[in-house]
Amino acid sequence: MPAVRILILAACCCWLLLLPVRCCGPGRGPVGGRRRYMRRLVPLLYKQFVPNVPEKTLGASGKSEGKIRRGSERFIKLVPNYNPDIIFKDEENTGADRLMTERCKDRVNALAISVMNMWPGLKLRVTEGWDEDGHHAHDSLHYEGRALDITTSDRDRNKYGMLARLAVEAGFDWVYYESKAHIHVSVNTDNSLGVRSGGCFPGTAMVMMETGKKKPLSELKLGDTVFTTDETGLLIHSVVLLFLHRDPYKTATFVLIEAEGHPTKLLVTPNHLLFIKSSSSTGFQPTFAYRVQIGDLIQIYVNGTQVQSSKVVRVSVDEQTGVYAPMTEHGTLLVDGVLTSCYATVESHTLAHASLAPLRLFQGIASMLPDLHTSDGVHWYCHILYVLAKYVLWWDMP
């Protein structure tokens, strides 16, 4: 039997390698490979920051861990960036501006490609990177190699709003149109759980059962039938197949979303997918929760047989213990009365749903692997998908 299991898993892994390629075609390589979807890029406004939370919260770049001093144990974890497509100002002539964390290096290299694609002939310019001279506030992320100040090589300030938007798309954890002279960007720590975690809801979040009663996610079980919607917005039943992530003891930061005329607040982790209609989109699109802005539309259930649109009136952050990510057979569900995707990390509901097809089609495989589908933590299958996407297919994952 162990040999049979290994063969089955190997066959599934081979299929998984083909799924994303078949759906999206070839990528651009290890850097800048984030899949782009058909939506208009809207420049940031002066003094706007994304996500709409303070920089040093867990929903953005996280807390400061203290200054990194040259020669210290933490200093050796900073890596130099010699990307020829980036101009480093380096006014100190020490090479300090080239030093940054691995995550920061990945993001800025991705941004450099986007800049050249957006404005042929121009390059990204870094005016400030790691700071060892004490020129910033005492808890600045510049002291940790996690923050950069950037411009375009032509220093055209009319481009800075779009440069900030490109930085958001490149995966920086916090982007701020801070000054007329530059854009400020920063990232979370390389070892942060917030960087590697997917998307979930708190255990107190409620789903509506087929009986009409509500049940908290902490009590939801495999095989339960909950409400979701079809393509037209009509309510339908959907069976809970498994938990993509379940950890009752993990503390996480959630995006808190309040909608007009909806009594319940939705709490969801930043990289979870919601169906959002913004001013720049023609319909409801799968969107990371951290991108939600006041004025965007979400789909809520109040009563009757279908969902309705409601305007987002407040976005904030909250920290709670317990994370749950159930997956239904339809890939969607109503959580606290809001229509949500079951998926996270990849900003394509269709692709995520297709990639998890083997779990829906071959439940017998999971039954041959005792406890793997019921244990706490990230589901083993999702972990395989993440590793394949990030390290084999070279996808740019958050």
Swiss-Prot record:
One of its GO terms (cellular component) is extracellular space. It is an enzyme of class 3 (hydrolase). GO terms for biological process: cell fate specification; cell-cell signaling; positive regulation of smoothened signaling pathway; protein autoprocessing; regulation of gene expression; self proteolysis; smoothened signaling pathway. Ca(2+) 1 binds at E91, E92, D97, T127, E128. It holds the Pfam family Hint. Zn(2+) binds at H142, D149, H184. The record marks T269 as: Involved in auto-cleavage. GO terms for molecular function: calcium ion binding; cholesterol-protein transferase activity; patched binding; peptidase activity. Ca(2+) 2 binds at E92, E128, D131, D133. The record marks H272 as: Essential for auto-cleavage. CDD domains: Hint. SUPFAM superfamilies: Hedgehog/DD-peptidase, Hedgehog/intein (Hint) domain. Its EC number is 3.1.-.-. A lipid is attached at G199 (Cholesterol glycine ester). SMART domains: HintC, HintN. A lipid is attached at C24 (N-palmitoyl cysteine). Residues 1-23 form the signal peptide. The record marks G199, C200 as: Cleavage. InterPro entries: Hedgehog, Hedgehog_Hint, Hedgehog_sig/DD-Pept_Zn-bd_sf, Hedgehog_Signaling, Hedgehog_signalling_dom, Hint_dom_C, Hint_dom_N, Hint_dom_sf. The keyword Transmembrane helix does not apply. Belongs to the hedgehog family. Interacts with BOC and CDON. Interacts with HHIP. This is Desert hedgehog protein B.
